[in-house]
């Protein structure tokens, strides 16, 4: 079973991944955002035109590696989706920050990497895609609250809003696997125990519905859920 959490910047996807990991007792493949793991990210925020294509190729390679490693662990949660990386590349292209040639190369590479091949021991689409829907106000508040210095430039505000719109449009049309959307403005699943219970219950219900969580595993998870509140 592979679960992917795909959500806008500042939505709480890493926090939700950690909660799910504890509940399902599965490892998480986190998005590389630290200076040590991803030295390109702060450079990108200082010069999107220079580093935009390079950053997206870095993420594409990392996400594909996560998919393969997730298969090896049998059950896993992936924090951030390879499918949504194209949202960032497309936004850069719309904003004139990457060239038509870079745009075409990226999408040709992505399509080639993500083509499902008959007989391959793993599939590339997740069993469940989880989205978190938040408002622009919530997004900007949380970006400011978490305090990553390279994200705080006021000139990035419109960029964040555009990405949020792009993400919502993408998630609405996503149909490669079952999906579930969490209303992130309505539930504080990080600090409120009841909200945490509700959100995790929604996810467990969906996993049961699609047949990836059954039998004794399902009973064990339901018992752990009841202990939250």
Predicted segments, located by residue:
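Pre-Walker A (Motif I) flank of P-loop NTPase domains
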Residues: 1-2
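Hydrophobic anchor at the beta1->P-loop junction of P-loop NTPases
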Residues: 5
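P-loop (Walker A) phosphate-binding loop of NTP-binding proteins
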Residues: 8
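Conserved lysine of the Walker
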Residues: 13
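Hydrophobic positions on the alpha1 helix immediately C-terminal to the Walker A/P-loop
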Residues: 16, 20
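Conserved substrate/cofactor phosphate-moiety recognition/catalytic segment
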Residues: 22-62, 88-89
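A glycine- and Lys/Arg-enriched "phosphate-lid" helix/loop adjacent to the NTP-binding pocket
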Residues: 88-165
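NTP-dependent small-molecule kinase module
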Residues: 144-229
């Amino acid at each position: 079973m592979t679960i992917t959490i795909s959500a806008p910047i500042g939505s709480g996807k890493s926090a939700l991944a950690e909660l799910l990991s504890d509940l399902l007792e599965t490892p998480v493949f986190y998005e590389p955002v630290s200076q040590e793991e991803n030295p390109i990210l702060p450079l990108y925020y200082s010069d999107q035109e220079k580093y935009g294509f390079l950053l997206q190729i870095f993420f594409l390679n990392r996400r594909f590696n996560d998919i393969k490693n997730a298969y090896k662990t049998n059950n896993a949660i992936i924090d951030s989706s390879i499918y949504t990386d194209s949202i960032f590349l497309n936004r850069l292209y719309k904003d004139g920050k990457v060239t038509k040639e870079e745009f075409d190369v990226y999408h040709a590479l992505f399509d080639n990497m993500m083509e499902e091949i008959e007989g391959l021991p793993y599939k590339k689409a997740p069993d469940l895609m989880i989205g978190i829907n938040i408002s622009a106000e919530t997004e900007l508040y949380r970006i400011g609250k978490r305090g990553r210095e390279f994200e705080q430039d006021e000139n990035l505000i419109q960029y964040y809003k555009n990405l949020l719109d792009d993400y919502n449009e993408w998630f609405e049309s996503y149909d490669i696997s079952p999906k579930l959307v969490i209303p992130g403005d309505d539930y504080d699943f990080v600090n409120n125990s009841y909200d945490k219970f509700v959100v995790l219950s929604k996810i467990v219900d969906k996993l049961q519905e699609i047949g990836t969580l059954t039998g004794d595993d399902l009973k064990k998870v339901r018992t752990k859920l009841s202990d939250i509140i």
